[in-house]
Amino acid sequence: MEGVAVVTAGSVGAAKTEGAAALPPPPPVSPPALTPAPAAGEEGPAPLSETGAPGCSGSRPPELEPERSLGRFRGRFEDEDEELEEEEELEEEEEEEEEDMSHFSLRLEGGRQDSEDEEERLINLSELTPYILCSICKGYLIDATTITECLHTFCKSCIVRHFYYSNRCPKCNIVVHQTQPLYNIRLDRQLQDIVYKLVINLEEREKKQMHDFYKERGLEVPKPAVPQPVPSSKGRSKKVLESVFRIPPELDMSLLLEFIGANEGTGHFKPLEKKFVRVSGEATIGHVEKFLRRKMGLDPACQVDIICGDHLLEQYQTLREIRRAIGDAAMQDGLLVLHYGLVVSPLKIT
């Protein structure tokens, strides 16, 4: 047939001879290693999976097994670290809440914020100013002094000066004492300490002003009082306790106010209940007139004339000057006698 190659036996043998001469001999094949059979009760090695070859989707080769174990332990440690961090955060939050509740307060440090605690409220000094001002001088309290009858507080110098011509509280108008209002006032050192802490440099400025005041006048600067040790009660005489304030020598003028009558048209008025009054010698006739107008409820158109002996007194004259000028003729049992009368004001007549 055409197109079919005819191979003879001789050609086949020649080809084999040529191929055997051209190809190298194959390497020797080592016999397979024999695995000893497991003894009774022992398990043999696990058979390898057919799909365990490298590059397959089966199990990893033996050399990658330590990495898989290390990754498992690393993941377990990371989970434990996260749990510890969460527990620490919860403990910190609880501690912060406890600190917030324990430190809940109002700081009065001149408006300065020491921490960022939201529950602490800062108060401006202007909100506290009405409580640390003296209503007489309109300044900050210096030597804060409180009236025991009404608990209103003023500067010591202001309230002592006020009591020279009045026995009433300048704030509520209550009678502090009929004759000696200085008996019913006390120093308030706690309030004064608060004022010094609230107002920066107030204490230093006050000390400097006091030092300059005494130095300009050539006087010795008074030293702060130092508490003395209490001596033993045995063998010591009893001492009379002195008042916190000494009664000024000016408060030694006792008055006897005598009513001599009123003209027609003076209007209605109340009689004076108490005609014995003790005031400062520096008080003027104008102060006495104001006292009479307030006590008697006089009409503004009513004029008050005050007479001592045969002298019609002027409003600017002080009681000490009147006593010195008139002498013993103005005195009766140690009292300065003043006569007063009510007349119609000349402005009303015209």
UniProtKB/Swiss-Prot annotation:
One of the GO biological process terms: regulation of transcription by RNA polymerase II
UniProt cross-references to InterPro entries, sorted A to Z: PcG_RING_finger, PCGF6_RAWUL, RAWUL, Ubiquitin-like_domsf, Znf_RING, Znf_RING/FYVE/PHD, Znf_RING_CS
Span list, region Disordered: 1-115
Effect of residue 59 to A: Does not abolish phosphorylation
Subcellular location: Nucleus
Expressed in which tissues: Ubiquitous.
Residue stretches of biased makeup (Low complexity): 1-22, 36-48
Alphabetized Pfam families for the sequence: RAWUL, zf-C3HC4_2
MF term (GO), any: zinc ion binding
Keyword check for ATP-binding: no
Glycyl lysine isopeptide (Lys-Gly) (interchain with G-Cter in SUMO2) cross-link, renumbered residues: 223, 234
Keyword set includes Signal: no
Keyword annotations from UniProtKB, A to Z: Coiled coil, Isopeptide bond, Metal-binding, Nucleus, Phosphoprotein, Repressor, Transcription, Transcription regulation, Ubl conjugation, Zinc, Zinc-finger
ZnF locations on chain (RING-type): 134-173
Description of post-translational modifications: Phosphorylated during mitosis. Phosphorylated on Ser-30 by CDK7 in vitro.
CDD domains linked to this entry: RAWUL_PCGF6 (cd17085), RING-HC_PCGF5 (cd16737)
Superkingdom of this protein's organism: Eukaryota
Comp. bias intervals (Acidic residues): 78-100
Compositionally biased region (Pro residues): 23-35
Subunit-level organization: Component of a PRC1-like complex. Interacts with BMI1/PCGF4, RING1 and RNF2. Interacts with KDM5D. Interacts with CBX4, CBX6, CBX7 and CBX8.
Designated name of the protein: Polycomb group RING finger protein 6
Organism: Homo sapiens
Source taxonomy: Eukaryota, Metazoa, Chordata, Craniata, Vertebrata
